[in-house]
């Protein structure tokens, strides 16, 4: 047991490496200053002009038509139920030649 009495307890101390110093806590002055900066920047942003649209008239017309066509596609797809879509698909398969023959799709499964 006397062999273990001289054992050094604690963390290892490496040469050339200083002990890590505790970080200083930030004072409330800095936090208050930062909050004031944020508030003043928000006020400045509110006084700035609104977003200016830099698109050409042709680009605006193109986007408007794109939105209109997309809405038409959505309404067209939403108007049919799944059952109706399956029936239309089966009717389309019936019109094809036997080269493309695949079994009919069941809407119940």
UniProtKB/Swiss-Prot annotation:
Keyword Electron transport carried by entry: no
Name the Gene Ontology biological process terms. apoptotic process
Biased composition of type Low complexity is found at 9-20
Q: Where does this protein have compositionally biased stretches of type Basic residues?
A: 21-30
Q: Which UniProt keywords apply?
A: Apoptosis, Cell cycle, Nucleus
Pfam family membership, one: FAM32A
Q: Where is this region: Disordered?
A: 1-48
Broad class of the protein's primary localization: nucleus
Q: What's in the GO CC field? A: nucleolus
State the InterPro entries in the record.
FAM32A
Cellular location(s): Nucleus
The entry's family comment says: Belongs to the FAM32 family.
Task performed by this protein: May induce G2 arrest and apoptosis. May also increase cell sensitivity to apoptotic stimuli.
Name recorded for this polypeptide: Protein FAM32A-like
Q: Which organism is it from?
A: Danio rerio
Specify the taxonomic lineage.
Eukaryota, Metazoa, Chordata, Craniata, Vertebrata
